[in-house]
């Protein structure tokens, strides 16, 4: 009976550790250029990221930049503030990475498959790629910050 109780508590501890690990990506991050803040949150079991702030130098005539490069002309007038640029990430505990996601690049108007991992608690590395070829893509570093 003692062994069962010990195994039960070890199982709970292991589950709690994995749960904490999966949510480490949640928070606010500066993009690589430190011009944009992205809030990463968990929604419906997946991780998403939304632009919440851009430095004032990015504004023109007091207006936030628009999604000018979007391939859909109907979306080019929408503000980048509030735009979801990360979508669909799930945590892979074996590889300690968030995978199966996508990232939208407002500079090019393109969406890429993407995965990410934490180099440290304050450094998130993301890699966008096409055609399922992970090694052929572009990497980006994001830095944890506050609102």
Regions found by a protein language model. Give the residues of each.
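Tryptophan-anchored aromatic micro-motifs
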Residues: 22-36, 51, 100, 142-144
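Short, surface-exposed coil-to-beta transition loops
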Residues: 34-37, 84, 109-114, 135-139
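Central antiparallel beta-sheet cores of small beta-barrel/beta-sandwich binding domains
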Residues: 41-107, 111-112
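Bacterial Sec-dependent N-terminal signal peptides
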Residues: 1-21
């Amino acid at each position: 009976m003692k062994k069962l109780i010990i195994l039960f508590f070890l199982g709970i501890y292991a589950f709690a550790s994995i749960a904490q690990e999966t949510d480490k990506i949640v928070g606010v991050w500066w993009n690589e250029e430190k011009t944009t803040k992205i809030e990463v949150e968990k929604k419906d079991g997946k991780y998403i990221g939304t632009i919440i702030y851009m430095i004032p130098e990015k504004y023109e005539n007091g207006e936030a930049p628009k999604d000018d490069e979007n391939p859909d002309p109907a979306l080019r007038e929408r503000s980048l503030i509030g735009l979801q640029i990360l979508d669909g990430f799930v945590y892979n505990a074996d590889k300690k990475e968030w995978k199966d996601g996508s990232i939208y690049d407002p500079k090019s108007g393109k969406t890429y498959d993407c995965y990410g991992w934490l180099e440290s608690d304050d450094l998130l590395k993301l890699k966008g790629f096409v055609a399922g070829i992970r090694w052929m893509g572009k990497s980006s570093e994001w830095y944890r910050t506050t609102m």
